[in-house]
Every structure is written in structure tokens, then in C-alpha cells.
């Protein structure tokens, strides 16, 4: 990580002590980065974003406006989090019986280059696979395998995408029309 003069923080945002921010990262209006958070290089944090204690965010990540990344969430490199999408970190929250602290928080992993659309809800304790595409408004209740296309409430796999997010079509043998992938037992494999 680098000195503050190598990244940008808007004057309306607040960075707690003990935060590590990578080079060329930009943190925009009214955002709060809490103690122990680590944000990689070349990452953009939009307006009104909260990054909780001890969250790890990779390089080249884009987190759009109005997103809260709660403790227990880890975001790998090149992930896109759409505006107003929601992470959760407790499986059965109750106001009467507070569940605060790392022993209650479920781990959620967003793998490299996944894209999460606007207004998506990701329940805690899940893994969103590499290059996954989660459609706007989906409610993700199960792990999403690498390259899967997930939409709806509850979220369902409705197809598969390539690294650029283009939907793949398959023949009757499970081979992609582009000839680069094969689908076996709901797992997308490179040929």
C-alpha cells in the first residue's frame, strides 16, 4: 500500500485509522471506510459506500453508489458491484438478540471478475464464482459457479457467460458454439 498522496479520497468521505488503500484508488462522496479494511490498487468506490471493518477488496474493483460491504465479505480483483446492491452478513438477524462480532458473521466470497447487477441481494455465506454475471434485482440464495448467469428471485442459473459477459450457446453435446467451452454436470470447462 502507498501513502495517501497516491490515491484520492473526496473531502466528504471518512477513512478510519488502520485502513490500507492501494495506489490510484478513488473514493468518492459521502463514503466511509472502517478500521482494518484493505482496498487494492486502481479501485473505484462510488458515492455513499460503506466498507466495514476488516473487509478485503482487491485491485481494479468498481463498487457503484449506495453499496454497503459488511464484515465477512471478501471481494477479489476486477469485480463489479452495481448500484444499490446489497450484501448481508448474518443469516438470521434479530433486533432483540443482537449478533455482533466476527463469530456471528458468515463469510461471503466474490471471486475474480464477477459482475453483480444493480439492486441485487447476496445472502451471506455464499461464493459468487469467477466471471459470474448476476442480473439486476436478483436475490442470490445459493453459490453461483464460475461463468454462471444468475437472474430472478430466488436467483437461478439460466445460462453461462464467457469472460466478457457474453451469453454462451451450446449444442446437444454440451459444446459451446464458439468451440472454446464444454458444459458437463452444470460445470463450465474450457476445451
Where do the model's predicted regions map?
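Conserved catalytic segment of ABC-fold P-loop ATPases
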Residues: 129-132, 145-147
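Flexible, glycine/small-residue-enriched loop-and-beta-strand segment within the central core
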Residues: 3-5, 11, 16-21, 26-127
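Cysteine-rich micro-motifs
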Residues: 173-186
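Short metal-coordination and nucleic-acid-contact micro-motifs, chiefly zinc-binding Cys/His arrays
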Residues: 155-158, 172-174
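Cys/His-rich microdomains that often coordinate metals
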Residues: 157, 166-169, 181-183
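P-loop NTP-binding/switch modules centered on Walker-like glycine-rich loops
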Residues: 112-113, 130-131, 141
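The −1 position to Zn-ligating cysteines in a subset of zinc-ribbon hairpins
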Residues: 149, 161, 167, 174-177
